[in-house]
Every structure is written in C-alpha cells, then in structure tokens.
Amino acid sequence: MNEPTQITDTKKRYAAGVLKYAQMGYWNGDYVPKDTDILALFRITPQDGVDPIEAAAAVAGESSTATWTVVWTDRLTACDMYRAKAYKVEPVPNNPGQYFCYVAYDLSLFEEGSIANVTASIIGNVFSFKPLKAARLEDMKFPVSYVKTFAGPPTGIVVERERLDKFGRPLLGATTKPKLGLSGRNYGRVVYEGLKGGLDFMKDDENINSQPFMHWRDRFLFVMDAVNKASAATGEVKGSYLNVTAGTMEEMYRRAEFAKELGSVIIMIDLVVGYTAIQSMSNWARQNDMVLHMHRAGHGTYTRQKNHGVSFRVIAKWLRMAGVDHLHTGTAVGKLEGDPLTVQGYYNVCRDTHTKVDLPRGIFFDQDWGALKKVMPVASGGIHAGQMHQLIDLFGDDVVLQFGGGTIGHPQGIQAGATANRVALEAMVLARNEGRDIKNEGPQILRDAAKSCTPLAAALDTWGDITFNYTSTDTSDYVPTPSVA
C-alpha cells in the first residue's frame, strides 16, 4: 500500500477533471478520530489492481460528500470538515485480498435521532461501487452525544421484568406452529396450551399478518382470550406477541390500538417494515406502555455473507437506538446462522451499558450507550429442552428462549412441551444457583429432572441428540471458530 498525498494547492485541487479520492482528501493516515465522530469499520475487497488505500478513500468519499469528478461547489461548504476520512487500512487476517478500512464521519453529517439517515449515508451508495468486488459494514461507533438523540427501547429489560413479576431466570416463549394456515380459533387453542403449560409468552411468526385463512382481528381476539384464561389458570402474567406488521403505517397503528384495547402487554413488528416505521412504532409503544418485539425477518439477505453486506452487530446497534425491547439475536446452538462467540457479541450489544472492544466476538469499538435502556435478546430457531444448559451457559438470564417446534412438536402435546421446557429451565437455574457446573453437568441435570417429569423425559428422548452443528459463515477473524457440541 502506498501512502498517497492530498492535493492542497487550491487551484489544482478544484481544477475541472477527475482526481483520486485520496488526493481529494478522503484519506488521512494521520487523522485522530474526535470523541464526536461517528466511526465505521468496513471490510473491503478491492478489484485487482486497485490500491487498498484508494479503495478506502473511495468508501469514505462515496459515503459522505464525494462524486466521481471534482465539483467547484465543494468550496461553498466547510468541505474539509464534511469529508469523511479513511484513517486506517489493515489486511484482514487469513483473508488475502480483504482489508479492514476505518472511516470517521463528522457528527454534523447526520440528522439527530434518525436511523434512516444514518443508513442512507453509510450504506446507501458505496456497496455497489465498481472499484470494490465486495464491501461489508462490520461495526460502528456512535458518540454518546448522538446516542442521546434517540429514545431507545420503550420499556427495557428491567421494567419488562417488573411488569411480568419474573426475575432470576430467562423468559420462555414459543412461536405458534404451523405459522400459516390455522383458523383463529385453533390458533388461540395453541396459544392457551403453551401458556397453560408454563411458558411466559407465545408469539406470531414473521409472516402471519392478515390472510384469507385468518383475519388479523380474529387472531387478536382468540389469542387474547387464550392469554387471559391462561393467566387466570396459572396466576402468572402471560403474553403473546401480536404481529401488527401491515402494508401502511396507518394500518399498523390501527392494529396496535386494537391490541391495546384487548389488554395485550406486547406487540410485534418485522424488520422488513423499515427503520422509519420501526422508530414510529417505538414511539407509539412508549406512549402506550407496550413492550415492542422485533423479529429480524429478512436480515440474512445482507448479514450472513462474510465479505459483503452488513454485520448483524451493526443492525443490533441501530435497532437498540431505534427503540425495540426484544430482538431476535441468534441461538448459536439452533438451526440458524451464528457461531457462539459472534452471537455473544450481538447479545452484548443489546445488554451492555458500555460495550468494550472484544475482537473474538467481533466488537471493534468501545460503545457508551448513555442512558439507553437494554434490549432483551431472543434466542429462537431450532432449539429444544435438551440444549437448556448450553443456552443458559452462553446467554445468562436476560434472554427470551423461544421453543417453537420444541414445544408444539412434543409427542405428548403442546402443554406437555411447554411443561418440559419450564421444568428443564427451572432445574438448570436451580443447579446453577447451587454452584454446579451446568455446562458440563447439564445433560445429567436434565436426566435427573426428567425422572419426576414425564414430559421432559419424552422431550429428551425425542430431541436429545438433535443438533445443528454446521460451520457458520460469519465467524471471527481473530480466533478459531468454537463449537458448542
């Protein structure tokens, strides 16, 4: 890599024509980021023959003020301040041809409290830039002064636990299955059985909205009837995530208002509604004392590939600022993408007060979250009672463990499946609190608990050996990929 020289002679710098991005001032290897800068780390793969520093400068330019040619109107602005500055480029370990590119952006480039504006700048244009074979946004750092322009989660972990009166353990949930095709009445029956058996939550899946087989209003009515009956039967606060995702904001508000009228404690939206809609629903949830659950539907289209797209750790940061209370963040042991360390990094982003640099977990920047409330991570997708020790060891207490098929697919029925999960959870938490090594003793702890719980014994017999131990595509560049098997 050759250290380029910025053209400082005004006449030459603004002469009509084309200059390299580094020469225009989008590279500064001596730049020291300010406390008020927004920082971004990109993984870039330059085209053959393209100098990595020039590629980094192009990323900085195209994500801030540059265009392909010199424009004299730059001189009408404080262009030296507004130009993003690539300030460090280093090879990605064990990935020839890939480079980590650090870029600093002046805070005044961004609108306060707008994730839509952040994304339009940082990922809006540069990812289709021809000099790059591929680009991926790996991490970001936001100054606390900018973080404070966002309201963040409307409820947060602490208040949610107070409303539920449930402490000292993970929360339990399940997604109603099959997620499409049930009538409203049968859907409500599934919800009742799951909650009566010991779950804290049931939930809609990402693509259940309002279809010919079940209108959204029917679903809400039958589900809330089931929630109320299960709460009365168990003496516990129960809930079911009512998906209010719709084609317009007006319709989403209408569905959310109806959920509130029925007494729901929680509503749900999908990531695909977009960041402006997410922030709008977050404001509504805050004004109406409602927990807001976020399903990350669609994220894998741009988070999964290691060399191109956006890391989910960045999405998690954006969503914490945008203001969601629950966020699907991976299981590490289930059927969906994510190795243990990388997924733990996502959880830390959701739950930390101050996130520290942690390269094995993919965290490249310190992040002060100011007074933003914490997001409750959700582990969902291909998990079952036999993995309870792994889940608690990996993620601790502040997590929702959602067993969809692992509840509804139980050989003795839905209520038995819920009971199996609740007993497995209670047994594991008790063993941990007594000082036992649940990571290594977990299988035996579960077998001992199953001696007095037929549903748990059946669950272990059915799924005890089921794993999804495939190699993840998105792993740390700094440590070998660990296994949970």
Swiss-Prot record:
InterPro entries: RuBisCO (IPR033966), RuBisCo_large_chain_AS (IPR020878), RuBisCO_lsu_C (IPR000685), RuBisCO_lsu_C_sf (IPR036376), RuBisCO_lsu_fd_N (IPR017443), RuBisCO_lsu_N_sf (IPR036422), RuBisCO_lsuI (IPR020888). Binds 1 Mg(2+) ion per subunit. It comes from the Bacteria. Its cofactor is Mg(2+). It catalyses: 2 (2R)-3-phosphoglycerate + 2 H(+) = D-ribulose 1,5-bisphosphate + CO2 + H2O; D-ribulose 1,5-bisphosphate + O2 = 2-phosphoglycolate + (2R)-3-phosphoglycerate + 2 H(+). The modification N6-carboxylysine is found at K203. Mg(2+) binds at K203, D205, E206. Substrate binds at N125, T175, K179, R296, H328, S380. Keywords: Calvin cycle, Carbon dioxide fixation, Lyase, Magnesium, Metal-binding, Monooxygenase, Oxidoreductase, Photosynthesis. GO terms for biological process: reductive pentose-phosphate cycle. SUPFAM superfamilies: RuBisCo, C-terminal domain (SSF51649), RuBisCO, large subunit, small (N-terminal) domain (SSF54966). The record marks K335 as: Transition state stabilizer. The active site is at K177, H295. GO terms for molecular function: magnesium ion binding; monooxygenase activity; ribulose-bisphosphate carboxylase activity. Its EC number is 4.1.1.39. NCBIfam families: PRK04208.1. Belongs to the RuBisCO large chain family. Type I subfamily. HAMAP family: RuBisCO_L_type1. The basic functional RuBisCO is composed of a large chain homodimer in a 'head-to-tail' conformation. In form I RuBisCO this homodimer is arranged in a barrel-like tetramer with the small subunits forming a tetrameric 'cap' on each end of the 'barrel'. RuBisCO catalyzes two reactions: the carboxylation of D-ribulose 1,5-bisphosphate, the primary event in carbon dioxide fixation, as well as the oxidative fragmentation of the pentose substrate. Both reactions occur simultaneously and in competition at the same active site. Heterohexadecamer of 8 large chains and 8 small chains. This is Ribulose bisphosphate carboxylase large chain 2. It comes from Methylibium petroleiphilum (strain ATCC BAA-1232 / LMG 22953 / PM1).
